[in-house]
Every structure is written in structure tokens, then in C-alpha cells.
Amino acid sequence: METVAAPDFARPASLVSETGNVLETQGLVKIYDGRAVVNGIDLTVGSGEIVGLLGKNGAGKTTSFYMIVGLVRPNSGRVIFSGTDVTNYPMYKRARLGMGYLPQEESIFRKLTVEQNILAILETMPLSKKERRHRCEELLHQFGIERIAKNTALTLSGGEKRRLTIARSLVTRPKSLMPDEPFSGVDPIAVYDVQQLVVNPRKTGLALPTTDHTARETLPIADPAHPIDEGQAASEGRKGL
């Protein structure tokens, strides 16, 4: 019987030794109704690194994540991105610095084709028509969606929509991409495919903090993972495989 090699989720060694932290949080605290739902979260994410925030519903991981991306304002603590204190920055200012956000929900235009979805973002950038076309083709190829480039988003499968959503989030070449529970609602058969979609961009040095309410899908790709319970980060989880 032919032996199938185990998936390689390892981070490139050059990215470990030659780059510093892209993202850092210092003592993040969020209080709702007199209760600290997040109580002193410290986190660092380096270039080319995937860091998982793990925990059950209500543990504080999503609130921590939302404070990082700018959806929720912390009561205290700081968020540092590329050397800039962005704690009080709205999402659009963080995006201008290169902080990308990938929500759980589909963020695509359903009535546009796959390539039109990508070009819609490219048209907001200071690029020539030729440069926009080249970048679009580059992303279509990178995510294996060239053959469906002319298909409308309405006709796509769940996996194809996920590919398009991630491709759109990388159009502007962000320094970090923050997928919010990327495995939520994903068919078990498609988990490996989504893991690859999350892992591949880090080969270019992209920093990837991510959240998940189960460890099974995230632990194999995270380096490291931080379990969160009752608003606090527990001991660091095992490294990615």
C-alpha cells in the first residue's frame, strides 16, 4: 500500500529567525456589566506565524479577537500593530496599516462573478488596469479558482466561497490576516482544504492570529495556541505539527 505523507504545516525557518512581531497585545481588559469578560490578555504574533485563540463559547476569545481588529474598544490595555499603538484606531485605520480581517460570514458580492469580486477591491487601489488584471489572475491561480472565474458567486459551493473570501481579503497584501473561526460550519471532509487555505498565505510572511471554539482543527496549524478560559489566557498549547 502506498504511504501518504503527512501534511506539512511547518512555518518556514527563515520567517522565524529573521522577522519580529507584527502584532502585540498588552494586558487587554474588557468589562461588561461589572464583569471582566477579558482580563489581561497578552499576545504576540510574528511574521509568518499562526497563533490560535482557543476556548469554548463565552470564554472571552471572541471579545479578545474583536478588540484586536477594532470591533470592540478595550477598557484598558494596548494593541500594537507594526510598531504603532492602534488601540483607539477604528477598523479602517487599522486596515490602512495592513491589518486584514476575515469574518465568519461570507463577505462576497453574490451577483458578481468570481473575478469581478476580486476586481471590485482592486479598483479601489492606485494600480493601472494591467496591474489590476495581473493581481487578479495571480489570486485566481493561488486559490485554484481560475476555472470558475466567470461564474457568479451565487453558484459557488461552500468551499469555493471560502476560497474567494480569503482571496478577496488578500487583495491589498495585508501584513496580517485575522480569520474569525475559519472552520465554523465547514464540512469535516473540507477541513484539510481550509487548513491549507489558512496556512499557505503565511509563506509570504503574513501574520495570522485566529480563533476557534474547538482545538481539533486549529492545533495542527497553530504555533502556538493559547487556550482562553474565563477571560484569561491559560498555559500555551502545543506547537503546530
Residue ranges and their predicted role:
Residues 69:
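Helix-to-loop junction immediately C-terminal to a conserved catalytic motif
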Residues 152-156, 160:
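Conserved ABC ATPase signature
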Residues 177-180:
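Catalytic Walker B motif of ABC-type/P-loop ATPase nucleotide-binding domains
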Residues 119, 130-148, 195-199:
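Conserved ABC ATPase "signature" region
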Residues 77-84, 97, 135:
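Conserved ABC transporter NBD signature motif
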Residues 54-56:
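The feature captures the beta-strand-to-loop junction immediately N-terminal to the Walker
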Residues 173:
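Conserved catalytic motifs of ABC-family nucleotide-binding domains
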